[in-house]
From Swiss-Prot:
It comes from Staphylococcus aureus (strain Mu3 / ATCC 700698). This is 3-methyl-2-oxobutanoate hydroxymethyltransferase. The active site is at 179 (proton acceptor). It comes from the Bacteria. Keywords: Cytoplasm, Magnesium, Metal-binding, Pantothenate biosynthesis, Transferase. The gene is panB. Homodecamer; pentamer of dimers. GO terms for cellular component: cytoplasm. It catalyses: 3-methyl-2-oxobutanoate + (6R)-5,10-methylene-5,6,7,8-tetrahydrofolate + H2O = 2-dehydropantoate + (6S)-5,6,7,8-tetrahydrofolate.
Length: 272
């Protein structure tokens, strides 16, 4: 199983880190089989697999349920599970209880929490043995306030992001996700941190990249961000479903090839 020290070693050797956001047993199993370094169980599962309008409806129970499934599918991959909205920021005692519950019940390698304001939480969680991945730039749980737009696009905002990144590292974060920020800013932050920096919509200057399984494979998604490249097309599965429907209605399925051949009704009738 990959560890924090191995990920740091990859950064030091300038070996790029691959990360995929996945939400269930079969997708996690595929991700591990592909040799991907890390899996993120993101609260984006709310929209992607649960049909919610946003991440706001995602609960701690949702994250635990899906985190467990992913761990079962990828026992040897570094798994990070999101703290959902409301799980951090109530009180330090409650925050740590939520973090411990998520970490223990999913058997994850780390949890992830969003925003620059969580540095005290990172310090406390680290102190009790919970590895935390920080998330700066565009933070999906805050899109109601900041909107879906490029972050760090002004001199002041860029300087603040650099400071925030240094602060979360100093607080004890084991890695950092940077989302939707300028390429040169992400590269600068990556150079100045000793922990791995994983980018999504942050250019190629980071230590690694993360994309959502469903986005990169075109699986049930209607809108994809500018930074998403499609690596396969799972939407062709709809064609298979249509063919199945046609064959059931026409009687073509199941044919003899898919039917058990043993004759039993003669025996049943002879007993009458």
């Amino acid at each position: 199983m990959k560890t924090v020290s191995l990920l740091i070693d990859m950064k030091q050797k300038q070996t790029k880190i691959s990360m995929v956001t996945a939400y269930d047993f079969p997708s996690a199993k595929q991700v591990e089989a592909a040799g991907i370094d890390m899996i993120l169980v993101g609260d984006s599962l709310g929209m992607t697999v649960l049909g919610y309008e946003s991440t706001v409806q995602v609960t701690l129970a949702d994250m635990i349920h899906h985190g467990r499934a992913v761990r079962r599918g990828a026992p040897n991959t570094f798994v990070v599970v999101d703290m959902p909205i409301g799980a951090v920021g109530i009180s330090m005692t409650q925050d740590l209880n939520h973090a411990l519950k998520l970490y223990q019940e999913t058997n994850a390698n780390a949890i992830k929490a969003e925003g620059a304001h969580i540095t005290p939480f990172i310090e406390k969680a680290t102190a009790i043995g919970i590895p935390v991945v920080a998330h700066l730039g565009l933070t999906p749980q805050s899109v109601g306030v900041m909107g879906y737009k490029l972050q760090g696009a002004t001199k002041e905002a860029a300087e603040q992001l650099i400071l925030d990144a240094k602060n979360v590292e100093q607080a004890g974060a084991v890695a950092l996700v940077l989302e939707a920020i300028p390429n040169d800013l992400a590269e600068e932050i990556s150079k100045h941190l000793t922990i791995p920096v994983i980018g999504i919509g942050a250019g190629k200057g980071t230590d690694g990249q993360v994309l959502v399984y469903h986005d990169m494979l075109n699986y049930g998604v209607e809108h994809k961000a500018k930074f998403v490249k499609q690596f396969a097309d799972f939407s062709v599965g709809v064609d298979g479903l249509k063919q199945y429907d046609q064959e059931v209605k026409s009687g073509a399925f199941p044919s003899e090839e898919y039917t058990y051949k043993k004759k039993i009704m003669n025996e049943v009738n002879n007993n009458d």
